[in-house]
Amino acid sequence: MLIFKRSDQLPKKATQIFIPIIDGQVVAGQYDKDFEIDLQEQLAFFAPADKPIKAGEIFEIPISMPDHSCNRISMVSLGKAEPSELRLAGAAIGRKLRGKSELVFVAVNLKSTQTKALLISANLGNFQWSLKRDQKPSESQLYIPTDDGVISAAQVISDAVNRARELIHTPSNIKNPEWIAKQAKRLANGTKVEVLSGSALKEFGGLRAVGGSSPNPGPRFIKMTYSPRTPGAKHVVLVGKGITYDTGGISLKRPYDIMAPMK
């Protein structure tokens, strides 16, 4: 996963530096003076003028910076910095850092909305799922010159999406009701979680009927309550259903070609 942090200066301990290419031009901005090479000249070697550079393409060049830990620069194309191109570029950065633990600096000078799109896509591209629950995921620190609000929003959104992906990828032989209840308690920071089970579900006939025959511990009813700080806020109720897949009557369910893979 990627942990976003703000830095207006190029960290001396950075092990990976990303420099943006926008519309074929290297845009190093104020950080250009930190490098002793002509980055545009280096780009011309990899990508001649008659060869268009696609968003998400990365060109890596070796460098020598005596006062810094980094020994290479990755120039990443943002295309024309359109939303879809920023997502491609961000995903490319995330994939390049996947499985690694690095201190990264991304030298971009974009609008807040553009930077947020780039960061969200980077963390989504970095996502890796594994059945090995005891295996600690790799973690890279990504520093970028932008507002704290942008960093906070990008971190929350991308982390939430990746957590949802973890839940989706977890197979149902692991993801039983008891497991889901534990995840609700683990993930719902700042939210009150109440889990009903056993005799507390006496009046929940439908829920007990569906989950009663499971060899795993019985069904769970999870109630999550968020109390906003602002008094008098409108009450919102979200109702969801999570079922470990029920194969009963699969021959009656249509369309069959879609139902079968769900097993």
Named regions from a protein language model:
Residues 1-242, 247, 255:
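Short amphipathic alpha-helical segment within the helicase RecA-like ATPase core
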Residues 248, 252-263:
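A glycine-rich phosphate/pyrophosphate-binding beta-strand-loop-alpha-helix module
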